[in-house]
Amino acid sequence: MASQGTKRSYEQMETGGERQNATEIRASVGRMIGGIGRFYIQMCTELKLSDYEGRLIQNSITIERMVLSAFDERRNKYLEEHPSAGKDPKKTGGPIYRRIDGKWIRELILYDKEEIRRIWRQANNGEDTTAGLTHMMIWHSNLNDATYQRTRALVRTGMDPRMCSLMQGSTLPRRSGAAGAAVKGVGTVVMELIRMIKRGINDRNFWRGENGRRTRIAYERMCNILKGKFQTAAQRAMMDQVRESRNPGNAEIEDLIFLARSALILRGSVAHKSCLPACVYGLAVASGHDFEREGYSLVGIDPFRLLQNSQVFSLIRPNENPAHKSQLVWMACHSAAFEDLRVSSFIRGKRVVPRGQLSTRGVQIASNENMETMDSSTLELRSRYWAIRTRSGGNTNQQRASAGQISVQPTFSVQRNLPFERATVMAAFTGNTEGRTSDMRTEIIRIMESARPEDVSFQGRGVFELSDEKATSPIVPSFDMSNEGSYFFGDNAEEYDN
């Protein structure tokens, strides 16, 4: 995807590259994906996993978490300085599931972090590639976004649970770099900033001294990341105010919450990438696919292609519905937790239901769950069509708000008009327009009030047949617009607790 000015495409962020042309980007992303695949194959060999066990998504997640933990410099250093009982700072591990005599057995494994780092480097031609690590972090983040709700976290920071669609990437670790920043929703960055400001209010020394200077730099950098997600001049000007504040406090928190609310209509630019579990890349590499030579893109047809012919399994608890488990993982694979369900259903070719109606819990299995009753089934991750992932948020044009879909942050660049009750959103903006940001607040409210619900997002963009890899003939779906298509309505999901 061509990007303007100094913006790098996601792929460049993800591979840490400078500006490259499309072919170079595809090759460097391919190199990253191939590295993950080779690492996964090697780990399966080390752990003596059968082909079936290697395709089990729970095993994939354990292996991914092990390598992420092995490279977590900060935490490793902390663990060495603060030894805790029964935790070896040099080792990492997790549950590996094996199929023995027709039953699933859980085995807890422990590995030297140094050994894991060696295997990772070897798989990546001797380099310490962080790009592949970030890629796995984003896959875990997308899985969390589809699985858990963040209502509690929202309420704790003084935000409203209805802003859940702004929370993409809220569980990404701090060390996820530029690629991580690109996929964070407006609400996620607002929440990080509010937490920071609250600490500053409670702790006199937070902004002081040498440490305080670093804190201040981090604060301003986060403000700039958030500013870059907004697409109207008034929102950006308000971010400048927040960033330049001498001593950030409640006024800034108010401004940030106001901005987060405004993002429900004036949506921010949030990137979406299809990050798949490591076992999928492993399978492809094992079957002789050369990612670097073929090239790969996280935002085009490639991930759809890969899922079309990968068979991945998952453990299923006694009263879970395998089709629902498949939907959960499909959404995670395409970063579609915040997409309109009608768009997702059309692309998937199967009805995608709201989370409140899913009979499935998360993918990971807690250590105290009974393995006796566990079964496994194939995840159905195929799709009927494919579509390009977006980073724009789907406003019809930059300066005018299109009436954004409440509780939806589009993933796919597919035309849809936006059903929404402006009244419900505007109700959130009664009251405070005084203070130093009053003119900007007034301007933002004016833009939102002039937003027309009949505006169409992604005009003329459509989905493509899986045989149409060059995206030549878009099929523009028509949606029944009578019902709002949010995944989160009637929600009863578990909270995300670390």
Curated annotation (Swiss-Prot):
Disulfide bonds: none annotated. InterPro entries: Flu_NP (IPR002141). It is found in: Virion; Host nucleus. Keywords: Capsid protein, Helical capsid protein, Host nucleus, Host-virus interaction, Ribonucleoprotein, RNA-binding, Viral nucleoprotein, Viral penetration into host nucleus, Virion, Virus entry into host cell. A motif (Bipartite nuclear localization signal) lies at residues 198-216. GO terms for molecular function: RNA binding; structural molecule activity. The keyword RNA-binding applies. Late in virus-infected cells, may be cleaved from a 56-kDa protein to a 53-kDa protein by a cellular caspase. This cleavage might be a marker for the onset of apoptosis in infected cells or have a specific function in virus host interaction. It holds the Pfam family Flu_NP. GO terms for cellular component: helical viral capsid; host cell; host cell nucleus; ribonucleoprotein complex; viral nucleocapsid. Residues 1-21 are annotated as: Disordered. A motif (Unconventional nuclear localization signal) lies at residues 1-18. Transmembrane segments: none annotated. Its main location: virion. It comes from the Viruses. GO terms for biological process: symbiont entry into host cell; viral penetration into host nucleus. Belongs to the influenza viruses nucleoprotein family. Encapsidates the negative strand viral RNA, protecting it from nucleases. The encapsidated genomic RNA is termed the ribonucleoprotein (RNP) and serves as template for transcription and replication. The RNP needs to be localized in the host nucleus to start an infectious cycle, but is too large to diffuse through the nuclear pore complex. NP comprises at least 2 nuclear localization signals that are responsible for the active RNP import into the nucleus through cellular importin alpha/beta pathway. Homomultimerizes to form the nucleocapsid. May bind host exportin-1/XPO1. Binds to viral genomic RNA. Protein-RNA contacts are mediated by a combination of electrostatic interactions between positively charged residues and the phosphate backbone and planar interactions between aromatic side chains and bases. This is Nucleoprotein. It comes from Influenza A virus (strain A/Swine/Iowa/15/1930 H1N1). The lineage of its organism: Viruses, Riboviria, Orthornavirae, Negarnaviricota, Polyploviricotina.
